[in-house]
Amino acid sequence: MQIEHSMLHLLNTASQTLVCAQAPLPIKEEKTAAFLERKLSKALGARKRKQGSFQENSLFLERLRQYRDKTISFDAFSTWMAEHLYAEKSECARYEDSAFLISEIVEEGRRNLIGIDQNYQSAMTCYPDQEQNNVLYETTVLPNGILKTDFVFVIELSDFTLYVLEEKSEWQGKETTLLASRYLQATTAPSFEETQKVMETVGKTMSEKYDMDVVKVLPKMKQMMKEAVEAQSEIAVAEVAEVLFQEVPYAKDLFVEEVKNAGIAAKVSTAHCRLAKSNKVQKLLADAEIEITLPLEYLSQPAKFEIIEAADGTYSIQIKNITNLKSK
């Protein structure tokens, strides 16, 4: 990751104070660069981020075009973004003390603008002093990572591809991503994590409905998603349906329709997505509270793992070619 520009503004709507940075952050300083890289990397790879699209009349998009075309500087654009966000948060009665980090980076040849609005916490630092004994000073602390309450956006400057990380909140009787809709003037699609949950729920429901083996169907879906994320390729819902429901062809269109009705696009981007550990394994629950956790790829390799159904309807599980066994 190459950090081109970075500025930090204070948006204290609780105390009605806006402090815009007068100088950029010292990105060449080793500790500052390391802190920024950790935080910006987490923003790029957040599993809960949602793909968004700007409305045609978006004021933010208009200013963004001016910045990309170099008619305004990073400092000026950064200050405008801070002032605009402060005004929107005040208008929505979002009274909180936050730091708004704005950075332009180059990652894998792509130039991105990243904004992270994050609540900061107060802390006390002790400085030993020979004359005054121990002196306590109040400081503010920003965490290294991205928190659930943060508002984050990532914009690829070449084509204005937008990703947003924001928890929904109630506004005028509706659950919405408030700052994305008001500040960016953009709409958002479900996140990769939400998409995965929807597809797994629909897949499980339809497997049970058509008397298919759920133990085989869900791991297949998880494996396809895992491979797509590792390759950073799109997930086509129709292709997933084709693989899952080979035995029940008429279920393919129903699966695609149910997923579409849940608000999921026909093709799902996996750009910058990272898999949680739980998405790399499959848990099997059996009688007598037996739980088996296996790597996903094992379920498609009969030489390593097999489920055998007996004539009386019971199952046997074989884990094969094990060279080492430990109690954990």
Task: Mark where each language-model region is.
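Long, hydrophobic alpha/beta structural blocks
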Residues: 1-279
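C-terminal structured domains
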Residues: 242-328
